Amino acid sequence: MQAVGQLMLDIEGTALSLADEALLRQPEVGGVILFGRNVESPEQVRELTDSMRAIKPNILIAVDQEGGRVARLRAGFSPLPAMGKLGEKFEHDPITALDLAYCAGYLMASEVLAVGIDFSFAPVLDINGVSRVIGDRAFHAHPIAITALSAEFMRGMKLAGMATTGKHFPG
């Protein structure tokens, strides 16, 4: 039987267990997403990602590092504001807000890549104010502002060398 796709899974701790190692060796596993429970420091995350790649060199490693309350990498990493703060700035100073969005994307991607993580599921492209779950994770309530700010955030990510993954769907 031929596999149609690969799975992205998570692990429980800050280091690979024997069970994690066995699971990563399975051909169906193509990626791992890290959560806060997997993170102690940049050095520890680098050791973790290196250990994953020792088992499966081409594994994709991801994280949710949006800024604000959705930041799995905290200790030793630069805190970024919720993207809604950039939307607020956009209201009265769009040029600065766009520059800050670019810088935030670059900084986030640079730090994430430096510890061996391939990409962050960011930015959030939802419309601010539609969902309490999303809240200030979204840039703005107006699609034109969302488009402008997210384009700059993604431009920063790309300059750092990271692929972008806008979310959520259906949007």
Residues covered by each model-derived region:
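Enzymes and membrane/adaptor proteins characterized by extended Gly/Ser/Thr/Asp/Glu-rich
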Residues: 28-48, 52-146, 168
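Phosphate/pyrophosphate-binding betaalpha-module
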Residues: 149-170
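N-terminal glycine-rich anion-binding loops that anchor highly charged ligand groups
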Residues: 16-29
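Boundary/entry segment of secreted carbohydrate-active catalytic domains
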Residues: 1-16
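Hydrophobic "anchor" residues on beta-strands that sit immediately upstream
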Residues: 6, 60, 163
